[in-house]
Every structure is written in C-alpha cells, then in structure tokens.
Amino acid sequence: LDPMSPREFAEAMTMSGSKVEGWEIEGEKLDKVVVGQVLSIEKHPDADKLVVCQVDAGGEAPIQIVTGASNLTAGDKVPVALDGSTLVNGTKIKKGKLRGVESCGMMCSLGELGLTAHDFPYAIEDGIFVLQEECELGQDIRSVIGLNDIGVEFEITSNRPDCFSVIGLAREAAATFDKELKLHTPVVKAGHGDCAGLLDVKIEAPDLCPIYSARIVKNVRVKPSPRWLRERLRVMGVRPINNIVDITNYVMLEYGQPMHAFDLRSIDEGKIRVRRAKNGEKITTLDGTNHVLTDNQLVIADAGKPVAIAGVMGGEYSGIVDDTTTIVFESANFLGSSVRITARDQGMRTDASSRYEKGLDPNNCIPALNRACELVELLDAGDVMDGIIMDDHSKAQPRKIPLEADWINRFLDLSLSEEEMRAILSKLGCQFDGDLVIIPTYRPDLVHKADIAEEIARFYGYNKIPSTSIRGGAQGKYSARQKFDQTISRTMLAAGLSEIMTYSFVSPKVYDKILVPADSPLRKSVVISNPLGEDTSIMRTTALPSMLEILQRNYNNRNASAHLFEIAREYIPTAENELPVDCLLYTSPSPRDISGSR
C-alpha cells in the first residue's frame, strides 16, 4: 500500500465495511530510551545493595546511574531511560539522588519496556535487560527491540469467518485501495521419508467433521522462535512459547485455520479417530483442567482415549514438550455449532473455538497444513516427511449466483457497467462462468443477488452513491386500529399512568406463578424453535405475568405508588391463523388491584 497514516487506513477500511475499532503504535509511550553501554561498576558508598555505574548513552559524556541490579558487568549494552524520559506505563524518569549519590537516569528491565522473557528468551525477568542485538550507542531502543509496528484492531462480524485471518483482511484491504493481492503459495520440500504406516486417520462422525488432515515432522528441534516471528505474534496479542507452538498460532492468525500439534509418541497404536465422546470419558487439557465429556461432544482420540477436545483444546498428555522428537500437525474442519456447544458446556472458549464457531472453509485445511510444514523447514525446526494423511468427507463446492447488472443498478440507484462490477468482484476472489458469479468457498455470507449488490456497493464506495428521496405513490397514514391504540395510550398517560413495554417471549413457568390451571387454554402457547434461553422459549398467551414482573421490580425499588399500563399483544394459537389479540392492562398502587380489557 502507499504510505498513509493509521487514521487514513482505518477510515478507508471502515467505509468499505471492515470496521476498525482502533489502532496502537507500538512503543509510542516510550520516549528518550536509548542504547547505553556500562563502562564501569563501583559499590555505592552508603548502600550495600546498590552500585554506581558509569554509562555511555551516546552523548558527549558518560552519565552516572545508581541501580540495585546484580546481573551487570562492564561492557554490557542495556536500555537506558534518560533524564526526562517516559516508560510504557507512563512513568517519568527524572534525575535524582539515591542514598546521597546522583543518578541521571535508569537502566531498564524487560517489564519496564512492556516485554517478557517470551519476547527475548535470552534475557532474565528480574534484572536489567542486557541486549544481545546488533545496535549502536544512543540508538532509540524501539528500533532495536522491534517496538516500531502498528497494530490495527478490527470488529469482525460473525458472518465473515474469512476475516478472522490476516489473509482475509489483506484481501479486503487490497479491494479497498484497488491494489493487487499477492498471496504466497506454501511450498514444502519434505523428502525425509514416507509417513505411510506411521499414522492412521479415520473420521467416525463425518456429520461433525467433514475433513481431517495431518502431516508428520520427525527430528523435531524445540527451541525459541526467531525474533521476527516472536514480534509478529506479540503485535497480534499472542505470547510466544516455542517454535512448534508458535508455528500453529502463526498459521491460525495468517490463514484463520486453527492448528494443533500432537506428540506422536502419545498417539496409542498410531491411530487417530474423530468420534463422539463416551458419556463420562475424561481428559485433562493443556491448561491443566480436568473435563468430563458427554456423548454430544466431539473428540480426537487414539486407540483408547481422547487426546483433544475437537476444535477447542488439546490434551495435556499429547502436548509438545522439550524432548518431543516427532510431531503430528493437525488441520481439520469441525461443525461450528458442535464446537460452540462443546466450548459452552465445558466452559472454555478459546481462539480456536471462536473461529470454528463461525463456520470455516474446509478447503482451507490443506493450504494451512502445508504452510505450517513450510515454516518448520524455514525455521529449521524439524524434518518434514512426505505425504498427507487425510480422511475427507467434505462436499464444499463454490456457490453460483446470477450477475444481474440491470437489477443491481436499479437496486443501488447506480449506472455501473457489468465490466466494472466484474472487476470489483474479481478483487474479492470471485470468478465467472458466463453470467454466473462463482463464489469462493471462504465466503459463506454471499448467497443471494442482494449480497452481490452489497459487495459492489461496499467497494464502489457508499459515499459515492447519490442521495435520493424515497419514491412511491402511497401516502402514509395511521390505520383505524392504530388511532384507537393512540387514543387509549394518551388517555392513560393523561390520567397519570406510565406506559411500559414488555417482551412477548416468556417462560412456561410464568403460568405456574399466576396459578393458571393445568388444563387452561392459556397454557397452549406457540413454542419458539430457536429460543435464546428457557426464559424466552414461548410466546405469551397473557400479558399479566410480564406486567406483574415490572410491578414487582418497582416495589423492590421502593416505588410503591407505581401506576402502570401496557397495550400488549397476546399470542393465542388458532386453527384459523387469526391475528394476535390486543389487550390493555393497568395497575393501581395496590398490587392486588389489576384491571384489563381486550
């Protein structure tokens, strides 16, 4: 992209439909913190636990700094906060005296720079950060330790699972700024033996897992990731762990495809079975939590036991440890609703589950798997074996939608040519078969021609669409029934009552609270097929319980003189499909005095 400010980028992305919530410039709060070199260290004359250091910070003369750190030697290069500097937490550093000796700055630890030992594994947490990076005296510390990136936070809607990835957002940015999107295709050299016979994969619940793929890496060398990878993870809000774990997290962020790595030694008989759990089965996950499973939850199991809760978290027993030598990379697709229920019931929502819940593209599994193995080779983290072990039941095919240019122009009140529309859609990965738009499988939100129109409007520019008055021959007016309701409402308000509005969805238990007989027609309610919860699972046949709930709330808040009324709808199922019944309820200061009419 052409150089631009974060604000310009955010405004353009937001206008094209990818809402930016904010951005953070790394190290923005760090000011006047530079590289210094310890020239000498002497004991403090009046404090046994303090030392006095002469430090060359790139200025005309060395500066004197008093510190209690014990991990310094002459010649060490360290971050130095000069007089008048600011740390990441907002702390101001000023010249002062410590036990009578002048100190003209402060040498910084990892924490004072907003870092941890995960960011720089060679450093220690509880001492001064001794730099091993190539740097010059007086150089701004932000450029030395990589605190010079900009992190942009997007608000991603649930219908755009493809945007839970860097590639997805890059595609949006390329279309927004009219640039070509150049995507890298993973290349795996492999050549370290055939994996045939080492692992057997079988999906026993294809309705919950359409595809499961795996690759094997031997001679694994578990070690810290290189700095560039640690920095990219950090700016994305992910803590670096080791090269293998970092690779799985990096691929998830880049491709939006959750990954997992098993220690092959822990896979009993070399068998992986994707199946429903058995009632009462137990597993301890990577966070050390014990879980009891039920038969509506999907697991990854070996010949005898679960080794992971599918789409949520791996098991502790099969995790990567320092002496791991052979690993299995997993890249699979799990049914979003199944993962959501499992994560909810087990009380553990993870980065992986939050992505699976949205519904991922099965065709993304293999590219992500190959990308992970490519990174293994790039980081010299192991030897990738030939072959992909896979069980594939997926039937994901691109959807085709007619491109009706005339209808889209009328719908948007535009006059774009069909070529202009095709150019916009092509930037989003769409292809064409005559007059049909071939929708990529990573865009499950594009279903109808109106969705195509929306994409064209987004990238043509909502601000370019001319404002026009709504045209129509009908004249709006209130119906007789609406006028009657308004008269009733105004009359009640004039009498000093307050109008309330309550939900039409209630719980079946409300009939018990108002002592409705078991055989009463009022209990024959319309049931909601997809309720938010038990409290909103049916349509009310009487507004009285809702009214009483509001009245009780007022009494609980010491409003004993509540005068309330509601013009409400009651939903009585009938064979003739009649319209719902309107009713009016009002209360006096006494909760026993409730009147109404229909």
Question: Predicted segment positions?
Answer:
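Single conserved hydrophobic/aromatic residue that forms the stacking wall/gate
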Residues: 586-597
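Conserved phosphate/anionic-ligand binding catalytic regions in large, soluble enzymes, centered on
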Residues: 76-77, 161-175, 239-259, 304-322
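Conserved mixed alpha/beta core segments that line enzyme active sites in large multi-domain catalysts
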Residues: 37-64, 248-317
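Phosphate-backbone binding interfaces of nucleic-acid-interacting proteins
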Residues: 1-193, 328, 344-347, 351, ...
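Terminal amphipathic helices with adjacent charged low-complexity linkers/tails
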Residues: 177, 181-199, 382-407
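Extended, well-folded interaction surfaces typified by the phenylalanyl-tRNA synthetase beta subunit core
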Residues: 401-560
